[in-house]
Amino acid sequence: KKYMLTSGMSGYIPNRSGSAVSGSWEEPFVSLGNPHVNDDSRASFNSQISKVFRVEGTDQLIAMADRWVPDYPVDAHRADLFERAIAAHFEPEKYHVLPEEKRELMNSPMLQSANTSKALYVWLPIRWERDRPKIDWLDCWRPQLP
């Protein structure tokens, strides 16, 4: 099987991740949903997955994620606002963003204004639940050793 972990399209602002599986690279992928478990921020623990590593000599996978704008934490309200704003661009008759919400969006770190020199990384292990990748928040953990 081939697995894919994805991020939405909100520039440097974190968003909900997705996971998908396929029998091969040539077949369609089927969505498995958000791999982040109990993520109250709805923003992938305020990060965007950029790479998955296998710990050499083990079966353990580690997700490395960028936290581009650590000074701009995303909570469920902000996540909803960004999701609606992006959706409204493609389906304006279905999704709506109020003028005050647009102002809030315009005050967020944009591609031109985000200070990415402050970026951090989030490293979390991937566990498997019935052939689905799951990522839990852990304040502290150690990788498996061979």
Report residues per predicted region.
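Carbohydrate-active catalytic/glycan-binding domains of CAZyme proteins
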Residues: 1-146
